Regions:
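Bacterial N-terminal signal peptides
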Residues: 13-24
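N-terminal leader/targeting segments and the immediate start of mature chains
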Residues: 26-75, 283-314
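Bacterial N-terminal signal peptides that target proteins for export
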Residues: 2-15
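C-terminal low-complexity, charged extensions that often adopt amphipathic alpha-helices
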Residues: 123-166, 278-299, 307-314
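Hydrophobic lipid-interacting interfaces of membrane-associated proteins
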Residues: 64-70, 95-97, 108, 117, ...
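An acidic-aromatic
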Residues: 87-143
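Edge/loop elements at the starts and ends of beta-strands within beta-rich repeat scaffolds
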Residues: 51-59, 71-74, 81-86, 166, ...
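Gly/Pro-enriched, hydrophobic low-complexity segments
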Residues: 161-288
Length: 314
């Protein structure tokens, strides 16, 4: 009977140990309780993501957004700041720092200004206005601010209409009405994904290129990178992944979320410069050059394209 040399056995042991360490690094490192029944799982979600009061009256978010289509990708830097109760501001910059868009959401709706063209657009419905301008997330800036902060009360209905057990653990809760029609929770009561109908006002890059979308037009928003899985204190997901029809996707990587009290009114103002061309979106769509700022469908030099590979930020 022959035996492998000691050096070979030592190498095999080292490889096995490295594999075990890699598996351990990939597994969630949290001490949260797990739930095997849907009702306790849903209650854990409500206790953590619905019922707590907001930490402050406002916030300041720094994030990067990668919008990908099957043929291109566009990366921008995003700052979202202001009061949860509005007004809220969002500034969008190219990766090289060039300001692409300035937006303000308040009780009057959404106002957006594009400095390079000196053009402004407005709509009384902030959700419709944002989607006409190419923002991929299917809800208002306020709802986006809430979700980034780990608060879902403005989107998720109270009582599900049906419940499904998932083979991998966790549960899927379906709703017949509201912006969110499906909420998937993991076994810790944390949002894993949400689904809902896509507004007729938002068009994917394929649709803007003239390709029809067959079947249901739906969006799926996945949540990843919870800080407690890395041994940090529990907090909101730091990566939001939006999947859209025809292969479009948007990945929002949250770099920082800071609670802020009582923003000064002038800090949230959006004054248009003299000579800016203004256009209401109430009865006509935004021009393609405006909606391409986020999706990168226009001139790459203008839109801050960084040669990112589609799908590279999953």
């Amino acid at each position: 009977m022959s035996h492998a040399p000691f050096s070979t056995r030592r190498t095999l042991w080292a490889l096995a140990l490295a594999a075990l360490l890699a598996l351990g690094a990939c597994a969630p490192q949290n001490n949260l309780p797990q739930y095997d029944l849907p009702r306790p799982d849903l209650e854990a979600f409500r206790t953590r993501f619905i019922e707590p009061a907001l930490p402050a009256s406002g916030l300041a978010v720094r994030a990067s957004l990668l919008y990908s289509t099957p043929t291109r990708a566009n990366r921008t830097d995003v700052q979202l700041y202001g009061e949860y109760a509005r007004p809220l501001r969002m500034d969008v910059r190219a990766g090289i720092g060039t300001m692409l868009a300035l937006m303000r959401e308040d009780s009057a709706g959404l106002l957006a200004f594009y400095p390079d063209k000196s053009r402004a657009y407005a709509h009384s419905d902030p959700v419709i206005g944002a989607q006409l301008l190419g923002l991929p997330f299917p809800f208002s800036l306020r709802d986006l601010a809430m979700v980034i902060s780990g608060h879902f009360e403005s989107l998720v209905p109270g009582e599900p209409d049906s419940i499904r057990v998932l083979p991998r653990g966790g549960f899927a809760f379906s709703y017949n009405q509201g912006p969110v029609r499906l909420l998937v929770l993991d076994q810790y009561g944390r949002p894993e994904s949400m689904e809902g109908p896509l507004s007729k006002y938002f068009r994917t890059q394929a649709e803007r290129d003239g390709q029809p979308v067959s079947g249901k037009r739906e969006w799926t928003l996945k949540f990843a990178a919870y800080p407690e899985d890395d041994g940090d204190p529990a907090g909101p997901a730091r990566r939001l992944i939006l999947l859209l029809p025809k292969g479009d996707s948007a990945v929002l990587r949250v770099r920082a979320v800071e609670p802020r009290q009582s923003w000064a009114e002038k800090s949230l103002a959006l004054a248009l410069p003299a000579g800016a061309h203004f256009m209401s979106l109430e009865s006509r769509p935004a021009p393609v050059t405006a909606s391409d700022v986020i999706t990168g469908g226009g001139d790459n030099a203008e839109q801050g394209h960084e040669n990112a590979k589609p799908g590279s930020a999953s």
